[in-house]
Amino acid sequence: MNIFLILGLVLSALIGLSLGLIGGGGSIITVPVLVYVLGVEAHDAVGMSLAVVGATSLAGSFLHYRRGTMHLKTALIFGAAGIIGALLGSPLTKLLSPSALMMAFGTLMLVVAILMLRRKSRTEGSDSDVPKEGLSFWKAVLAGFGVGVLTGFLGVGGGFLIVPALVMFGGLGMKDAIGTSLFVIFLNCIAGLVGHASQNQFDRNLTALVTVLAVSGTIVGTLLSHRIAAAKLQSSFAVFVLLVAVFLMTKNYGVLLGA
């Protein structure tokens, strides 16, 4: 078996593990794994990523719902706004070349890593999951719409944005935000996938294999999320995202200059 295929499958399980543990993060790694490890063309990888992350998030959200850490009402508000944003964002993918698309990923990941590290430092030492305040409906709608646009455009579920938005605008504690984020990601991915389905040809066998491993990872991650401090996981993952961002930007910067 090809060593890159083995590595890609291992990383697929880690993608699911991250989604289950911190309610995001794994989705932003899916496209780079598909492109640079499994050899999928960049535009096709965006659609495949939506399918993989959507199925994985649905499995994780179901487990969180059974544990009482998934708020359906809040998820539906974010999700409804996100669906509209994802449908509008999907056609924008074709406006960028593969190298430009990867540069956009790298830039977004760099911002995400910084935000995750800053949020970790602000919340460190507080594991409270008591809601802070009531749901701010219109702020939630605007935040959901913005995340949806990113989902459709770049093929990311947006959990790294949804979790802090749910804490700030949805009044949820960290663990509840993680569970709720997974269902919002699922809704956004379905909407984004509709926009990409008619534009791309997916390798169904590879998509199914990656999905099975990612779902397995998210089941394990969800079970572990109630035992491990999310702040510690978040800081480690932020460093990983930062390293991947530097790799993507370095690899594609020269290509764009020579275009």
Report residues per predicted region:
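Membrane-embedded alpha-helical segments of transport systems
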Residues: 51-59, 84-85, 92, 184-191
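Small-residue hotspots at the loop-to-helix junctions and early N-terminal turns
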Residues: 42-46, 178, 182
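Short hydrophobic/aromatic, small-residue-rich stretches within specific transmembrane helices
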Residues: 49-53, 181-185, 206-207, 211
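Short, structured loop/turn "capping" segments at alpha-beta junctions
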Residues: 124, 157-161, 172-176
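Transmembrane helix boundary and interhelical junction motifs in multipass membrane proteins
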Residues: 21-30, 155-165
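Hydrophobic alpha-helical segments of membrane proteins
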Residues: 149, 153, 186-193
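Juxtamembrane transmembrane-helix boundary motif
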Residues: 1-17, 31, 36-37, 42, ...
